[in-house]
């Protein structure tokens, strides 16, 4: 119901011309680059998203778009196509990026960039967050004790609580080794059989699929660490350096050319993460902080807007335009202003 209401309101914003007004402003002010962040590609409205985006934006490969953003002003280049620059990115490298996103990219002639996690690609393991869901849903016990709490798994709310506990422990692990050790202990405690892998679409890409996509000319690739840890929680700076630097080395060995872009896992950075990206000699790094990028943007803290493929394209249109973010901030400002006024009124009343 909530999504339907938001879609209807988005339709009002769109067909009233408000979204077009934002587009006009971006086209007639300094050059902007919008970077979108997808993850999965199957089971949603990706096709309708791409139809809308292709019509209203000038979509370029991420590296090409960044080069134009930072260099066009210095060269004094005037572009005939004044549409706002946009780059499409997919994090993690799910198999459905190959079966769905790649297919649509070729069909609609829309370039995309996929950020890969090579540590998973060379094994048959699923991503750790997929593994977390799989463990809880395939538990063979009715009761388990994790981190000093007992969970009664016949109750859905207890299963959800356990999934949240596991996810938090794994996400905030101080090292990749500790993360994998904890997952192994949970698998044993839940008596989950080794067979029964997640759906194929949720598995990592293989190198053969990556090469096939790159050869098409419509897909490029960036780095997303070797094992997808949260860089901010890793306690050893040397491990942060390895996750960031070795990822680039592995990708370049497989692809045969430089890899210049990096995406922070979870959008989480930390001082060590930022330093590691700079020392690994990447040209650019993207976060998941929403907003636009200009030539004044920090090349290692580029903004990206996370998009859910299940969203209606109208929600995507208003989201990219920043309309919902504007009203959210206006609501917070209004609430703060009202509290201030009430406080002043109470003082005057005394």
Label each region the model flagged.
Residues 1-88, 96, 127-136, 141-144, ...:
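C-terminal active-site subregion of NodB/CE4 polysaccharide deacetylases
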Residues 79-82, 94, 103-115, 168-195, ...:
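CE4/NodB-like, metal-dependent polysaccharide N-deacetylase domain
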Residues 84-147, 153:
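Acidic/aromatic-lined carbohydrate-recognition and catalytic surfaces
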Residues 8-9, 13, 126-216, 338-350:
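Extended, charge-rich helix/loop segments that form flexible
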Residues 121, 227-229:
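Short, catalytically relevant binding-site loops at active-site mouths
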Residues 220:
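Aromatic-lined glycan-binding groove of carbohydrate-active enzymes
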């Amino acid at each position: 119901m909530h999504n339907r209401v938001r879609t209807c309101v988005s339709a009002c914003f769109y067909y009233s011309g408000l979204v077009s007004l934002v587009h006009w402003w971006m086209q007639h002010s300094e050059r902007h680059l919008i970077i979108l962040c997808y993850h999965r590609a199957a089971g949603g409205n990706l096709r309708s998203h791409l139809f809308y985006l292709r019509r209203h934006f000038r979509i370029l490969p991420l590296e090409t778009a960044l080069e134009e953003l930072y260099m066009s002003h210095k060269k004094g280049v005037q572009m005939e196509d004044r549409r706002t620059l946009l780059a499409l990115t997919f994090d993690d490298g799910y198999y459905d990026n190959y079966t769905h996103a790649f297919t649509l990219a070729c069909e609609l002639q829309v370039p995309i960039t996929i950020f890969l996690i090579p540590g998973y690609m060379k094994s048959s393991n699923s991503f750790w967050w997929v593994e977390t869901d799989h463990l809880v849903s395939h538990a063979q016990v009715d009761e388990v004790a994790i981190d000093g709490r007992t969970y009664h798994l016949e109750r859905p709310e207890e299963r959800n609580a356990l999934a949240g506990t596991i996810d938090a422990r794994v996400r905030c692990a101080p090292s990749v080794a500790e993360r994998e050790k904890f997952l192994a202990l949970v698998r044993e405690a839940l008596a989950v059989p080794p067979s029964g892998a997640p759906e194929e679409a949720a598995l990592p890409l293989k190198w053969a699929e990556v090469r096939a996509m790159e050869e098409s000319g419509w897909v490029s690739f960036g780095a997303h660490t070797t094992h997808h840890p949260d860089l901010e929680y890793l306690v050893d700076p040397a491990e942060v350096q390895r996750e960031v630097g070795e990822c680039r080395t592995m990708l370049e060995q497989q692809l045969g050319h430089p890899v210049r872009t990096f995406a922070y896992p979870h959008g989480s950075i930390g001082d060590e993460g930022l330093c590691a990206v700079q020392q690994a000699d990447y040209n650019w790094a993207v976060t998941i902080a929403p907003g636009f990028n200009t030539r004044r943007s920090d090349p290692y803290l580029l903004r990206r807007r996370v998009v859910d493929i299940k969203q209606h394209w109208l929600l995507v249109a208003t989201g990219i335009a920043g309309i919902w973010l504007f009203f959210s901030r206006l609501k917070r400002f209004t609430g703060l202003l009202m509290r201030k006024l009430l406080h002043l009124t109470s003082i005057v009343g005394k």
